[in-house]
């Protein structure tokens, strides 16, 4: 990459000190003209790299991977490479555009899909998908519906993928019974002396301990299939075409691993169909939006196009409830352990987050019959 005109000094900080070295190892077209931080992600360091080749401009996403969170980066990259290659083949066969409809890894000059710099940091690069935007909040029902279609379509395209080839990048990430076990230990150890002050929140979790293993038991017994799952199905992990308003591509594949589609569905509902912010202190503002819930079910099942089993569809409301309960349990566990995992911005922040999740669970329980009725409707 001779003739560089980019000043990397502004972004070459901390663990990203070797960004110029890393950028020079990938097979980009043209000469770099700009490199700046990009997006709202908190885990990896993400940059937009722009290049010029004659009159043509090209854009790439360059990422330094967080190997504290993802401790098997090689396995993670094998997952992403395998899944995106498979998706590309399916998309081409169905007449789609693989450069817009799935992530495309850019190889290094050594023919790999990642680079380890001289300080030991792991880097990767993707083609940048133009004329597409991500949304951090559900601004319109249609956008939530489009994201649901995208995640459902992702499930359908990968329904024959050999799941056994996937590495579990974060072991037991959505294993609710194990999360419950961790929570119980945190209560028992009470490392920070906080348990007495949250006895009602602890009781809320304990009252639902019989439900914790409902989906995992079905998965372990073969009652529902083990599938390729995304495991971070937030709205902002779907790109929406800025002209047509339709979903284009599912992104952020770091947590792609074996799991259940029921939990992928449920985590989207937890995040997107809540009428309040995740850390809302006024719990009267927290509720499940049934119109958003229905829009998401409709989009998800349309995207799946019949690839889910009847047992999976019946469990979708449980996915929503258990993902919300699990998330609240994780926030409360972290609060009891001294706020070591989730970043906090005020005293009691994790407790506020836990209370919000539990309030959402309570509202789901009030609306349970309607949640089940909507899941049973025929959308396709």
Place the predicted regions along the sequence by residue.
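Long, compositionally biased intrinsically disordered regions
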Residues: 364-367
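ATP-dependent phospho-/nucleotidyl transfer catalytic cores
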Residues: 3, 10-13, 29, 36-40, ...
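Active-site activation/catalytic loop segments of kinase-like enzymes and analogous catalytic loops
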Residues: 262-306, 322-341
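Conserved ATP-binding subdomain of kinase catalytic cores across diverse folds
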Residues: 34-38, 42-188, 258-261, 272-273, ...
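Conserved active-site aspartate in kinases
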Residues: 252
């Amino acid at each position: 990459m001779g003739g560089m005109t980019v000043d990397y000094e502004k972004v070459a900080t901390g663990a990203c000190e070797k960004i110029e070295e890393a950028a020079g190892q990938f097979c980009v077209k043209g000469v770099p003209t700009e490199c700046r931080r990009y997006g709202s992600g908190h885990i990896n360091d993400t940059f937009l790299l722009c290049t010029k080749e004659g009159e043509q401009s090209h854009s790439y996403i360059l990422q330094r991977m967080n190997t504290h969170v993802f401790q098997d980066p090689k396995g993670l990259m094998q997952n992403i490479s395998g899944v995106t290659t498979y998706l590309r083949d399916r998309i081409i066969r169905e007449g789609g555009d693989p450069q817009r409809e799935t992530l495309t890894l850019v190889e290094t000059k050594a023919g790999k899909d990642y680079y380890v710099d001289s300080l030991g940091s792991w880097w990767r690069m993707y083609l940048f998908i133009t004329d597409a935007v991500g949304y951090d909040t559900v601004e319109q029902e249609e956008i939530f519906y489009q994201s649901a279609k995208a995640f459902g379509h992702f499930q359908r395209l990968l329904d024959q993928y050999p799941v056994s080839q996937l590495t579990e990048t974060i072991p037991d990430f959505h294993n609710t019974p194990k999360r419950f076990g961790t929570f119980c230990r945190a209560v028992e150890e009470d490392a920070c002396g906080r348990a007495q002050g949250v006895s009602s929140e602890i009781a809320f979790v304990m009252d639902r301990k019989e439900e914790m293993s409902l989906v995992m038991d079905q998965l372990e017994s073969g009652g529902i299939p083990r599938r390729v799952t995304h495991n971070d199905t937030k709205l902002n992990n779907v790109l929406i075409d800025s002209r047509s308003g339709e979903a284009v591509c599912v992104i952020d594949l770091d947590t792609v691993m074996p799991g259940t589609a029921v939990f992928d569905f449920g985590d989207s509902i937890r995040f997107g169909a809540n009428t309040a912010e995740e850390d809302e202190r006024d719990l009267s503002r927290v509720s499940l939006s049934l119109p958003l819930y229905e829009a998401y079910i409709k989009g998800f099942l349309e995207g799946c196009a019949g690839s889910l089993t009847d047992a999976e569809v019946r469990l979708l409301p449980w996915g929503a409830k258990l993902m919300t309960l699990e998330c609240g349990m994780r926030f409360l566990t972290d609060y009891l352990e001294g706020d070591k995992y989730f970043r906090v911005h005020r005293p009691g922040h994790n407790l506020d987050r836990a209370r919000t999740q539990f309030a959402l669970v309570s509202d789901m329980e009030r609306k349970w019959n309607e949640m089940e009725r909507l899941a049973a409707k025929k959308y396709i």
